[in-house]
Amino acid sequence: MGCKKKGGPLFYDRCFRKIKAMKDKVAVVIGAGDNLGSAIGRCFANEGFTVVAARRNGDKLTNLKNDIESKGGTFYGFSLDARIENDVVAFIKEIEQNIGSIEVAIYNIGGNIKFSITETSSQKYYKTWEMAAFGAFLVGKEVAKRMLPRSNGTIIFTGATASIRGSDGYSAFAGAKHAKRSLAQSMARELGPKGIHVAHVVIDGAIDTPWIQELFSDFYNEKKDQDGLMNPDDIAKNYLWLYKQPRNAWTHEIDLRPWIEKW
């Protein structure tokens, strides 16, 4: 039987298999970019998880797909705009029905923009909030619906320095990240007693990416020489650590930074 892509905003990078009994646990990474998001996906795949990754342009998931499948892992890729409620609902439903029960979900979306308050248009502010906070709400809500009957699961949100303090020129980003952090705190207090671990990860430092290397070469080289840039794979290990925590000693927020970062 030939494979056909399904209409609408979601697509599969390969045919879905109807699975009656799924041994592998499912890890969902929403915002699976080339750096941290992909590192998180690889990290969970290495632990035997079936990885479901989503980003707005799912065609860009090819490298992650190849990385995981070359090591014998199972991978599914989607195109998804997490700001659109109907698409998020369909995305979570498709996973639960056709891949397996979601064991851990990571929301890793948030656009970092810098504009003075007078140059921050309502459109820029709203879009930044949609990406970081509203999408997190939509995903958190739909995943929680599935996890609650099982009394089990982990939901992790990626934060930033802006989650805990606002800086000059970052009114939109800080506002959105503060909202995401508050969402995570509220969900943790509500869902924790029901068996669902909710955590927020503050990334307080520059991540080692080609983008930073290209645009800020002097900064990059100085920090790199001092081991002062955050390795995406090392960050990802903390997400796995959060998932593995016993429920008698859960962490609901961690902050990660290089050893030389001022804070």
Locate each region found by the language model:
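C-terminal helical subdomain
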Residues: I196-V202, Y220-W263
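Conserved glycine-rich Rossmann-like NAD(P)H-binding loop of the short-chain dehydrogenase/reductase
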Residues: F49-N63
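Conserved glycine-rich cofactor-binding loop
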Residues: G33-N35
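Catalytic loop of short-chain dehydrogenase/reductase
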Residues: T154-A179, Q185, R189-P193, I207
